[in-house]
From Swiss-Prot:
Assigned protein family: Belongs to the oligoribonuclease family.
GO molecular function: 3'-5'-RNA exonuclease activity; nucleic acid binding
UniProt GO cellular component terms: cytoplasm
Keyword annotations: Cytoplasm, Exonuclease, Hydrolase, Nuclease
Protein name: Oligoribonuclease
Lineage: Bacteria, Bacillati, Actinomycetota, Actinomycetes, Mycobacteriales
Compartments, record wording: Cytoplasm
Ranges for domain Exonuclease: 19-184
Amino acid sequence: MSESENNTTPAVAARDDRLVWVDLEMTGLDLKRHVIVEVAALVTDANLNVLGEGVDLVVHATEEELAQMDDFVTNMHESSGLTEQIRESAVTLKEAEDAVLALIEKHCDPAHPAPLAGNSIATDRAFIREHMPRLDEALHYRMVDVSSVKELARRWYPRVYYKQPEKGLAHRALADIVESIRELDYYRRSFFVAEPGPTSEQCADDAQAAVDRFAPYFD
């Protein structure tokens, strides 16, 4: 995927405001028993422009590791073609981790670690922490979870929620990332305050209103 440069794309934002989008496919959800079998990553700037080429790697797993998949995961990975690619792959998890770290080094400021971004990323972060600790250390402890925005849209602006772009449900890592970036772009257009945003005075008024509303809980 090449860097987006057209008249409809916001200017590329500062290097210290990058987001690292990672999606994993695993053999299951048990950190100790299951393994990572696909790693995809893209870096965007603050305006959600995709920067350069990303990472999209299938990681080899042994037959014993594949046997740990339950029926649901087995069917999902077989239907997507991932299982066959896992068996054919010679890529190790360390090599996949190295590739993501190289992507981060190329596009992000090491003095300002970028947050991990994605959809429902708590499980991905847990597997990163357990199985790719160097990558975990390279990321900011904060995360940008698009599913949090989705849940707020459902409660505050149901029309926004129900009109979100449809997902392909490919259950492949790179496709999932692109869909997550696209979804956040949609929410930014439909849900958030349009640029240039509120004035400083409006922000101050809103902050005071929030303080006043919840002041009784601090008495």
